[in-house]
């Protein structure tokens, strides 16, 4: 069979690159074919990938936050290429308006992302904003898109830590 991928070469529901297929995709339904457009292979392959890259099952991925206006620009990340200025939550919380409504352990290291800042003309500089953790960065190793990582992490919440 011929595989057809996206313009960048990714295949299936979870956009696996050829090397990712080789290293992480599994024939979960044991029909002697890995089909990444079939739920029986695609979802277990994605779960296998996350497990192998070091996903921490009981740690958060991100929280949507509201930022204080006084946050220094250096703490705002808008590129997936290099998440910078990671700090402990106990430091970053001073810049988060809705911190008291979040259930975050203060000893975790995190960064702040503003995904719309550099690509949407006229986007509000501080909204939407997210505080992201190590699991989020694991997803960026899979696909260097801030939005892709947010989508995967949102699905993770829907699956209640089953992956």
Predicted regions and their residues:
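Catalytic glycan-binding domains that act on GlcNAc-containing polysaccharides
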Residues: 1-120, 124-132, 136-163
């Amino acid at each position: 069979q011929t595989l057809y991928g996206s313009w960048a070469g990714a295949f299936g529901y979870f956009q696996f690159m050829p090397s990712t297929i080789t290293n992480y995709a599994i024939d979960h339904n044991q029909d002697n074919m890995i089909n990444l457009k079939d739920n029986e292979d695609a979802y277990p392959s994605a779960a296998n990938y996350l497990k192998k890259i070091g996903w921490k099952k009981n740690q958060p991925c991100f929280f949507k936050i509201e930022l204080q206006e006084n946050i220094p620009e250096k703490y705002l990340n808008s590129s997936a290429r290099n998440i910078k200025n990671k700090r402990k939550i106990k430091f970053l919380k001073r810049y988060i308006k809705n911190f008291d409504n979040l259930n975050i352990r203060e000893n975790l290291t995190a960064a702040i992302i503003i995904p719309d800042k550099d690509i949407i003309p006229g986007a509000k500089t501080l909204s939407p904003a997210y505080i992201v953790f190590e699991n989020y960065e694991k997803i960026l190793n899979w696909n260097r898109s801030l939005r892709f990582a947010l989508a995967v992490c949102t699905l993770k919440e829907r699956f209640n830590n089953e992956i």
